[in-house]
């Protein structure tokens, strides 16, 4: 089953699900993508796949009708980060991210780089604390706050810099929605349907729990990509979210 469209702008989905692609071979990635419907999810392309296959992979996904979250977590000096974010916007991605720990000047430069794109600009999201990190990991870096406290501090800085939202764990979502308002988007990895293995994500939730917590976009990987019937798995997840709503 293959779904095609002329560009990512043709994708129409109200689903909050973003499927994380994690493939070492381009053909296998596209074979998986051709089994699912762009009306049921968006797709996330990370560092490994983008390094292996480059911008053409993003174009291939867009041609199939999918919105793409380019998950490269830019973290560099302000000018370099701004140019990278603008390049992502030129590529037509739906969402791009930076590390909030890059600081206010870097995030503001990234935001300003998207101004020429107006309504066609991608969502600009900042990463707070990686979901694989616990308190001991932060202590190793000299951060004495808990992951939740550090994430909230970085999220507040992100909002002050005018970005669209943050990547955060689902456990932070309720507090973040209260602190930063409904318009501030929350993107959450580590989302796994009930019965899935935790993998390398320490702070996880089910899709239904994440929706109740206030998550706007939930990233789901192997429970979908390794499913024997990924299209049905997506439909089941979306149906459960509609019931929860």
Swiss-Prot record:
It comes from the Bacteria. One of its GO terms (cellular component) is cytosol. One of its GO terms (biological process) is 'de novo' pyrimidine nucleobase biosynthetic process. Gene3D superfamilies: Aldolase class I. This is Orotidine 5'-phosphate decarboxylase. One of its GO terms (molecular function) is orotidine-5'-phosphate decarboxylase activity. PROSITE patterns: OMPDECASE (PS00156). Keywords: Decarboxylase, Lyase, Pyrimidine biosynthesis. CDD domains: OMP_decarboxylase_like. The active site is at 73 (proton donor). NCBIfam families: PRK00230.1, pyrF. Belongs to the OMP decarboxylase family. Type 1 subfamily. It comes from Salmonella typhi. InterPro entries: Aldolase_TIM, OMPdecase, OMPdecase_AS, OMPdecase_bac, OMPdeCOase_dom, RibuloseP-bd_barrel. Its EC number is 4.1.1.23. It catalyses: orotidine 5'-phosphate + H(+) = UMP + CO2. HAMAP family: OMPdecase_type1_B. Pathway: Pyrimidine metabolism; UMP biosynthesis via de novo pathway; UMP from orotate: step 2/2. Catalyzes the decarboxylation of orotidine 5'-monophosphate (OMP) to uridine 5'-monophosphate (UMP). Substrate binds at residues 22, 44, 71-80, 131, 192, 201, 221-222. Homodimer.
């Amino acid at each position: 089953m293959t779904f095609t469209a002329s560009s990512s702008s043709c994708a129409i989905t109200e689903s909050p699900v973003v499927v994380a692609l994690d493939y070492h071979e381009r053909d296998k990635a596209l074979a998986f993508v051709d089994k699912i419907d762009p009306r049921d999810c968006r797709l996330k392309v990370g560092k490994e796949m983008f390094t292996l296959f480059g911008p053409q992979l993003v174009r291939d996904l867009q041609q199939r009708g999918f919105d793409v979250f380019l998950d490269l977590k830019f973290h560099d000096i302000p000018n370099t980060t701004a140019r990278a974010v603008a390049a992502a916007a030129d590529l037509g991605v739906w969402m791009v991210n930076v590390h909030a720990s890059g600081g206010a000047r870097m995030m503001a430069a990234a935001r300003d780089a998207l101004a020429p794109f107006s309504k066609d600009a991608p969502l600009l999201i900042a990463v707070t604390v990686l979901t694989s990190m616990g308190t001991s990991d932060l202590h190793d870096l000299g951060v004495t706050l808990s992951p939740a406290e550090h994430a909230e501090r970085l999220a507040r800085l992100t909002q002050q810099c005018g970005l669209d939202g943050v990547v955060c764990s689902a456990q932070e979502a309720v507090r973040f929605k209260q602190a930063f308002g409904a318009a501030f988007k929350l993107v959450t990895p580590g989302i796994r349907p009930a019965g899935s293995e935790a993998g390398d994500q320490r702070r996880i939730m089910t899709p239904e729990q994440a929706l109740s917590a206030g998550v706007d976009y939930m990233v789901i990987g192997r429970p979908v990509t390794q499913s024997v019937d990924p299209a049905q798995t997506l439909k089941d997840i979306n149906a459960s979210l509609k019931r929860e709503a």
